[in-house]
UniProtKB/Swiss-Prot annotation:
Belongs to the anthranilate phosphoribosyltransferase family. This is Anthranilate phosphoribosyltransferase. NCBIfam families: trpD. It is an enzyme of class 2 (transferase). Its cofactor is Mg(2+). PANTHER family: ANTHRANILATE PHOSPHORIBOSYLTRANSFERASE (PTHR43285:SF2). Transmembrane segments: none annotated. Pathway: Amino-acid biosynthesis; L-tryptophan biosynthesis; L-tryptophan from chorismate: step 2/5. The keyword Lipid metabolism does not apply. It catalyses: N-(5-phospho-beta-D-ribosyl)anthranilate + diphosphate = 5-phospho-alpha-D-ribose 1-diphosphate + anthranilate. 5-phospho-alpha-D-ribose 1-diphosphate binds at residues 79, 82-83, 87, 89-92, 107-115, 119. Mg(2+) 2 binds at residues 224-225. It comes from Rubrobacter xylanophilus (strain DSM 9941 / JCM 11954 / NBRC 16129 / PRD-1). Catalyzes the transfer of the phosphoribosyl group of 5-phosphorylribose-1-pyrophosphate (PRPP) to anthranilate to yield N-(5'-phosphoribosyl)-anthranilate (PRA).
Amino acid sequence: MLREALRKAAAGEPLSEGEAERALETIMEGGASPEATAALLTALRVRGESVQEIVGFARAMRRFAARVRAPEGVVDTCGTGGDAKGTINVSTAAAFVARGAGVVIAKHGNRAATSRAGSADVLEALGAAIELSPEQVSRCIEEAGIGFMFARTHHPAMRHVAPVRAELPFRTVFNLLGPLTNPAGARRQLVGVFSAGYVRPMAEALEGLGAERALVVHGRDGMDEITVTGPTLVAEVGGGGVEEYEISPEDFGLSRHAPDGLLGGDAHLNARILRDVLSGEERGASRDVIVLNAGAAIYVAGKAPSIEEGVRLAEGSLESGAALAALERFVRVSRRLAGRGA
């Protein structure tokens, strides 16, 4: 099967969803050489991955994932990463603000690849236990209302791909698959992407994979989040189609900020900024971008009828202390489940 997929990809022909799915199954079963895997990923990158190929790859990767139990309506705020902007960990912080507003979160994430601090790095710096088993994550979601699924732990078959990805000097389809392969099966998502060109394709892929409601976003400043420096492109999935529009911070009563106000650093600095926002000590650009993204997550969860109402609930989560309490409970529960004490 992989040989035929390679032939078609090398000829510039698109793979069907089923062909892409079977090709990745072969790779993740260890049935492909590193050279064949690299050739396929390179050919797809040169031509540009189609929505059908992305969906097929995601279906295969989901099948090999270590599953996590979570209630209906659970939300993920995992993005693609890779915007190389050096900003704070917005989606990680937004997850705790949304949790403080009553949203159940199954956060999928990893260590940094192109930035200095990924979600796993920051959560670890905050004191959380991040390398929990699928059963432990399921219990964490049940007890704390939020769980973190470390990609390396929950996608063990990626060991057949990781060395090849490390050798290739460019992004591949796998940079898109993280948000599409949540091990808890989240069907409500806020997904940031690193390029405006992927906003609609990712939304169409999510629709093809059965998303109930999702927002795919890309800041005009290049952020893979909803930005507060200017407009953000949005593709919304839900209601039987994909709707594209643009939003700005002023639409939600928030200020526009200079890009420098969103800069972070290593995991420890980003963890400190996250905690400062959640505790109410930081009220500038960092707070506003976290509130806006949390508001979008609250809307995606169905807890608010609009992003604007979601932003109001996000502000309430911060002001009441619920967001900080959500972080502290997550750290405490994750450590106990990992056997590290409270």
